[in-house]
Protein backbone atom coordinates (compact mmCIF):
# COMPACT_ATOMS: atom_id res chain seq x y z
CA UNK A 1 0.00 0.00 0.00
CA UNK A 2 1.26 3.47 -0.86
CA UNK A 3 2.08 5.59 2.20
CA UNK A 4 -0.37 8.28 1.03
CA UNK A 5 -3.16 5.73 1.49
CA UNK A 6 -2.22 5.01 5.12
CA UNK A 7 -4.50 6.30 7.90
CA UNK A 8 -3.86 9.92 8.86
CA UNK A 9 -0.88 10.29 11.19
CA UNK A 10 0.69 6.87 10.54
CA UNK A 11 3.01 7.75 7.66
CA UNK A 12 6.65 8.73 8.32
CA UNK A 13 6.10 12.36 7.30
CA UNK A 14 3.06 12.75 9.55
CA UNK A 15 4.92 11.05 12.39
CA UNK A 16 7.83 13.46 11.96
CA UNK A 17 5.55 16.50 12.04
CA UNK A 18 3.61 15.28 15.06
CA UNK A 19 6.36 13.67 17.16
CA UNK A 20 9.64 15.09 15.85
CA UNK A 21 12.35 13.61 13.63
CA UNK A 22 14.13 11.96 16.57
CA UNK A 23 11.20 9.56 16.99
CA UNK A 24 11.57 8.12 13.50
CA UNK A 25 13.51 4.96 12.71
CA UNK A 26 16.33 5.05 10.16
CA UNK A 27 14.04 3.51 7.55
CA UNK A 28 11.33 6.10 8.24
CA UNK A 29 13.81 8.97 7.87
CA UNK A 30 14.93 7.53 4.55
CA UNK A 31 11.30 7.24 3.47
CA UNK A 32 10.80 10.96 4.12
CA UNK A 33 13.84 11.75 1.96
CA UNK A 34 12.93 9.27 -0.79
CA UNK A 35 9.31 10.50 -0.83
CA UNK A 36 7.90 8.12 -3.43
CA UNK A 37 8.09 4.40 -3.99
CA UNK A 38 7.39 2.32 -7.06
CA UNK A 39 4.56 -0.01 -7.98
CA UNK A 40 4.19 -2.58 -5.21
CA UNK A 41 6.89 -0.98 -3.06
CA UNK A 42 6.37 2.16 -0.97
CA UNK A 43 9.11 4.54 0.18
CA UNK A 44 9.36 2.90 3.62
CA UNK A 45 10.00 -0.50 2.05
CA UNK A 46 12.65 1.09 -0.16
CA UNK A 47 14.29 2.57 2.92
CA UNK A 48 14.34 -0.83 4.60
CA UNK A 49 15.85 -2.42 1.50
CA UNK A 50 18.62 0.19 1.44
CA UNK A 51 19.48 -0.37 5.10
CA UNK A 52 19.40 -4.14 4.72
CA UNK A 53 21.63 -4.07 1.65
CA UNK A 54 24.24 -1.61 2.96
CA UNK A 55 24.08 -2.52 6.64
CA UNK A 56 23.43 0.97 7.98
CA UNK A 57 23.27 4.68 7.23
CA UNK A 58 27.02 5.32 7.10
CA UNK A 59 27.67 2.66 4.46
CA UNK A 60 24.62 3.79 2.50
CA UNK A 61 25.59 7.46 2.47
CA UNK A 62 29.15 6.71 1.37
CA UNK A 63 28.22 4.21 -1.34
CA UNK A 64 28.68 5.12 -4.98
CA UNK A 65 25.79 6.02 -7.25
CA UNK A 66 25.98 2.82 -9.26
CA UNK A 67 25.75 0.67 -6.13
CA UNK A 68 22.86 2.62 -4.59
CA UNK A 69 20.92 2.65 -7.84
CA UNK A 70 21.01 -1.14 -7.96
CA UNK A 71 18.30 -1.14 -5.29
CA UNK A 72 14.79 -1.37 -6.80
CA UNK A 73 13.04 1.98 -6.62
CA UNK A 74 16.23 4.05 -6.40
CA UNK A 75 17.51 6.08 -9.34
CA UNK A 76 19.77 9.11 -9.81
CA UNK A 77 17.20 11.53 -8.38
CA UNK A 78 16.78 9.63 -5.12
CA UNK A 79 20.55 9.10 -4.91
CA UNK A 80 20.99 12.88 -5.22
CA UNK A 81 18.46 13.45 -2.43
CA UNK A 82 20.37 11.12 -0.12
CA UNK A 83 23.70 12.75 -0.96
CA UNK A 84 22.27 16.21 -0.29
CA UNK A 85 21.15 15.10 3.18
CA UNK A 86 24.60 13.64 3.90
CA UNK A 87 26.33 16.84 2.81
CA UNK A 88 24.04 18.98 4.97
CA UNK A 89 25.04 16.87 7.97
CA UNK A 90 28.73 17.43 7.20
CA UNK A 91 28.27 21.18 6.82
CA UNK A 92 26.46 21.41 10.14
CA UNK A 93 29.45 19.68 11.72
CA UNK A 94 31.81 22.20 10.13
CA UNK A 95 29.73 25.06 11.55
CA UNK A 96 30.00 23.46 14.99
CA UNK A 97 33.77 23.94 14.89
CA UNK A 98 34.17 27.46 13.62
CA UNK A 99 37.16 29.74 13.44
CA UNK A 100 37.75 31.34 16.83
CA UNK A 101 36.03 28.62 18.84
CA UNK A 102 37.96 27.44 21.88
CA UNK A 103 38.48 23.68 22.01
CA UNK A 104 37.43 22.87 25.55
CA UNK A 105 35.32 19.83 24.68
CA UNK A 106 37.21 16.76 23.36
CA UNK A 107 33.93 15.19 22.26
CA UNK A 108 33.27 18.11 19.90
CA UNK A 109 36.66 17.60 18.28
CA UNK A 110 36.10 13.86 17.97
CA UNK A 111 32.66 14.33 16.44
CA UNK A 112 34.01 16.87 13.97
CA UNK A 113 36.91 14.67 12.85
CA UNK A 114 34.68 11.61 12.62
CA UNK A 115 32.30 13.42 10.29
CA UNK A 116 35.12 14.79 8.16
CA UNK A 117 37.25 11.68 7.79
CA UNK A 118 35.43 8.46 8.69
CA UNK A 119 33.69 8.01 5.35
CA UNK A 120 36.74 8.44 3.10
CA UNK A 121 37.75 5.55 0.87
CA UNK A 122 41.32 6.89 0.80
CA UNK A 123 43.68 8.12 3.49
CA UNK A 124 43.68 11.80 4.41
CA UNK A 125 46.26 13.49 6.63
CA UNK A 126 45.01 16.74 8.11
CA UNK A 127 45.90 19.46 10.60
CA UNK A 128 43.65 21.27 13.03
CA UNK A 129 45.47 24.56 13.62
CA UNK A 130 44.94 26.44 16.89
CA UNK A 131 46.13 29.72 18.36
CA UNK A 132 47.75 30.21 21.76
CA UNK A 133 44.32 30.10 23.46
CA UNK A 134 43.47 26.86 21.62
CA UNK A 135 40.97 28.65 19.42
CA UNK A 136 40.40 27.16 15.99
CA UNK A 137 42.27 28.82 13.13
CA UNK A 138 41.65 26.32 10.35
CA UNK A 139 41.20 22.66 9.46
CA UNK A 140 43.48 21.75 6.56
CA UNK A 141 43.69 18.54 4.55
CA UNK A 142 47.39 18.33 3.75
CA UNK A 143 48.02 14.94 2.13
CA UNK A 144 45.89 12.30 0.42
CA UNK A 145 46.66 8.76 -0.63
CA UNK A 146 48.77 6.19 1.15
CA UNK A 147 50.04 7.86 4.32
CA UNK A 148 53.35 6.58 5.63
CA UNK A 149 56.52 8.06 7.08
CA UNK A 150 57.85 8.73 3.59
CA UNK A 151 54.81 10.63 2.32
CA UNK A 152 54.36 13.11 5.18
CA UNK A 153 56.91 15.89 4.96
CA UNK A 154 57.61 17.74 8.23
CA UNK A 155 58.84 20.80 6.34
CA UNK A 156 55.43 21.20 4.66
CA UNK A 157 53.68 20.91 8.00
CA UNK A 158 56.03 23.45 9.58
CA UNK A 159 55.61 25.80 6.61
CA UNK A 160 51.83 25.75 6.90
CA UNK A 161 51.91 26.21 10.67
CA UNK A 162 54.14 29.27 10.27
CA UNK A 163 51.99 30.66 7.47
CA UNK A 164 48.83 30.41 9.59
CA UNK A 165 50.65 31.56 12.75
CA UNK A 166 49.41 28.60 14.73
CA UNK A 167 50.64 28.04 18.28
CA UNK A 168 49.33 24.50 18.66
CA UNK A 169 48.36 21.65 16.35
CA UNK A 170 46.21 18.53 16.40
CA UNK A 171 47.19 16.17 13.60
CA UNK A 172 44.76 13.56 12.39
CA UNK A 173 44.31 10.98 9.69
CA UNK A 174 41.91 8.21 8.84
CA UNK A 175 42.25 4.49 8.25
CA UNK A 176 40.02 3.47 5.31
CA UNK A 177 40.09 -0.08 6.67
CA UNK A 178 37.83 1.22 9.43
CA UNK A 179 40.19 0.08 12.19
CA UNK A 180 41.54 3.04 14.16
CA UNK A 181 44.42 1.27 15.91
CA UNK A 182 47.61 3.24 15.07
CA UNK A 183 50.43 1.51 13.23
CA UNK A 184 54.13 1.76 13.97
CA UNK A 185 54.37 4.05 10.93
CA UNK A 186 51.77 6.33 12.54
CA UNK A 187 53.90 6.53 15.67
CA UNK A 188 57.04 7.31 13.68
CA UNK A 189 55.29 10.08 11.77
CA UNK A 190 54.02 11.55 15.02
CA UNK A 191 57.47 11.59 16.59
CA UNK A 192 58.98 13.27 13.54
CA UNK A 193 56.30 15.94 13.46
CA UNK A 194 56.47 16.52 17.20
CA UNK A 195 60.22 17.14 16.95
CA UNK A 196 59.83 19.38 13.89
CA UNK A 197 57.14 21.50 15.55
CA UNK A 198 59.23 21.80 18.71
CA UNK A 199 61.92 23.62 16.70
CA UNK A 200 59.46 26.47 16.12
CA UNK A 201 57.95 26.32 19.64
CA UNK A 202 54.61 24.93 18.49
CA UNK A 203 52.86 22.33 20.65
CA UNK A 204 51.58 19.07 19.22
CA UNK A 205 48.47 18.53 21.34
CA UNK A 206 47.34 15.24 19.85
CA UNK A 207 47.35 12.86 16.92
CA UNK A 208 43.91 11.35 16.37
CA UNK A 209 43.44 8.31 14.16
CA UNK A 210 39.92 7.96 12.77
CA UNK A 211 38.26 4.61 12.08
CA UNK A 212 34.69 3.79 11.16
CA UNK A 213 33.31 3.92 14.69
CA UNK A 214 36.09 5.15 16.96
CA UNK A 215 38.99 7.55 17.26
CA UNK A 216 42.27 6.67 18.94
CA UNK A 217 44.00 9.57 20.69
CA UNK A 218 47.79 9.53 21.07
CA UNK A 219 47.51 12.01 23.94
CA UNK A 220 45.11 9.79 25.87
CA UNK A 221 47.50 6.87 25.48
CA UNK A 222 50.39 8.94 26.75
CA UNK A 223 52.34 8.63 23.52
CA UNK A 224 53.18 12.33 23.26
CA UNK A 225 54.99 12.64 26.58
UniProtKB/Swiss-Prot annotation:
<dbReference type="GO" id="GO:0046872">
    <property type="term" value="F:metal ion binding"/>
</dbReference>
<dbReference type="InterPro" id="IPR025657">
    <property type="entry name" value="RadC_JAB"/>
</dbReference>
<dbReference type="InterPro" id="IPR046778">
    <property type="entry name" value="UPF0758_N"/>
</dbReference>
<dbReference type="InterPro" id="IPR037518">
    <property type="entry name" value="MPN"/>
</dbReference>
<dbReference type="Pfam" id="PF04002">
    <property type="entry name" value="RadC"/>
</dbReference>
<feature type="binding site">
    <location>
        <position position="175"/>
    </location>
    <ligand>
        <name>Zn(2+)</name>
    </ligand>
</feature>
<protein>
    <recommendedName>
        <fullName>UPF0758 protein Sden_0326</fullName>
    </recommendedName>
</protein>
<feature type="binding site">
    <location>
        <position position="186"/>
    </location>
    <ligand>
        <name>Zn(2+)</name>
    </ligand>
</feature>
<dbReference type="Pfam" id="PF20582">
    <property type="entry name" value="UPF0758_N"/>
</dbReference>
<keyword id="KW-0645">Protease</keyword>
<keyword id="KW-0862">Zinc</keyword>
<comment type="similarity">
    <text>Belongs to the UPF0758 family.</text>
</comment>
<dbReference type="InterPro" id="IPR010994">
    <property type="entry name" value="RuvA_2-like"/>
</dbReference>
<dbReference type="GO" id="GO:0008237">
    <property type="term" value="F:metallopeptidase activity"/>
</dbReference>
<dbReference type="InterPro" id="IPR001405">
    <property type="entry name" value="UPF0758"/>
</dbReference>
<keyword id="KW-0378">Hydrolase</keyword>
<feature type="short sequence motif" description="JAMM motif">
    <location>
        <begin position="173"/>
        <end position="186"/>
    </location>
</feature>
<dbReference type="InterPro" id="IPR020891">
    <property type="entry name" value="UPF0758_CS"/>
</dbReference>
<keyword id="KW-0479">Metal-binding</keyword>
<dbReference type="GO" id="GO:0006508">
    <property type="term" value="P:proteolysis"/>
</dbReference>
<feature type="domain" description="MPN">
    <location>
        <begin position="102"/>
        <end position="224"/>
    </location>
</feature>
<keyword id="KW-0482">Metalloprotease</keyword>
<feature type="binding site">
    <location>
        <position position="173"/>
    </location>
    <ligand>
        <name>Zn(2+)</name>
    </ligand>
</feature>
